[in-house]
């Protein structure tokens, strides 16, 4: 599997890199969390802007982003606006979403930016190219909070993300059975073995799928989201447990 190197952090090499989310509503609370998180054992902090009370206030986002970048020191910063249709807090019209993405580019604060595969639509390749020009790597994401599509569909979706230029295709799906968890894990291994052009991020959500958040090094997922006290998605495992298990399973 290839490696995405950001700030000396090689995503896709060795131990899966750990992401912890900031889901606070105010700038003050966001920055307090950032100061706390800067000392934790995690590689990347995700700012979930849809949880921010100024989620549609672009100047407020820009203002907070600059302070957040400083507060996190050397940790990677991932900007994410999870739309309501993909499990987030706020609904955005297509043009609003595009405007948000361009605003993040202009901050010059993002190490990584999440761009939703289906929300971006036909604009996806151009957005990814613009992100790269702005110096940000792209996590191209797709979330299904109701089901787990068949393995072939999961693989083809991640390949399409690669072909659009994404640095890190990401899939999060909801299992309805143990077989669904295995389907996601099989798709992950297939991508890592047959389409190693980029690292990938995958997870099966909820308690049933939690094993997928811990098995990435063996099966091919390069990053995992951990719960530092407040989860941003169902099934996120506590940060200290994630680190303990990743250490124990390190190849």
Task: Give, region by region, the residue ranges found by the protein language model.
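Active-site beta->alpha loop and helix N-cap motifs at the rims of alpha/beta catalytic domains
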Residues: 2-3, 13-133, 143-148
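Glycine-/acidic-rich phosphate or pyrophosphate-binding loops and their flanking alpha/beta elements
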Residues: 6-7
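Catalytic alpha/beta core domains of metabolic enzymes, predominantly
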Residues: 102, 112, 117-251
């Amino acid at each position: 599997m290839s490696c995405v190197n950001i700030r000396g952090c090689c995503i896709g090499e060795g131990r899966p890199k750990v992401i912890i989310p900031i889901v606070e509503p105010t700038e003050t609370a966001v920055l307090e969390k950032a100061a706390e998180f800067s000392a934790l054992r995690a590689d990347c902090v995700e700012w979930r802007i849809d949880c921010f009370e100024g989620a549609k206030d672009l100047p407020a986002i820009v203002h907070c982003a600059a302070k957040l970048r400083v507060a996190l020191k050397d940790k990677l910063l991932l900007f994410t606006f999870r739309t309501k249709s993909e499990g987030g807090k706020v609904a955005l019209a297509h043009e609003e979403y595009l405007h948000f993405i361009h605003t993040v580019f202009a901050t010059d604060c993002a190490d990584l930016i999440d761009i939703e595969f289906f929300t971006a639509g036909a604009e996806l390749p151009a957005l990814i190219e613009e992100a790269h020009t702005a110096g940000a790597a792209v996590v191209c994401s797709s979330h299904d909070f109701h089901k787990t599509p068949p393995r072939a569909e999961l693989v083809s979706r991640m390949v399409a993300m690669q072909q659009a230029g994404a640095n890190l295709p990401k899939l999060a799906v909801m299992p309805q059975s143990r077989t669904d968890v295995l389907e996601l894990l099989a798709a992950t291994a297939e991508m890592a073995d047959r389409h190693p052009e980029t690292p990938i991020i995958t997870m099966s959500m909820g308690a049933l799928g939690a094993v997928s958040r811990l098995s990435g090094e063996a099966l091919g997922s390069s990053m995992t989201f951990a719960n530092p006290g407040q989860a941003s998605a169902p099934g996120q495992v506590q940060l200290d447990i994630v680190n303990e298990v990743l250490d124990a399973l390190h190849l």
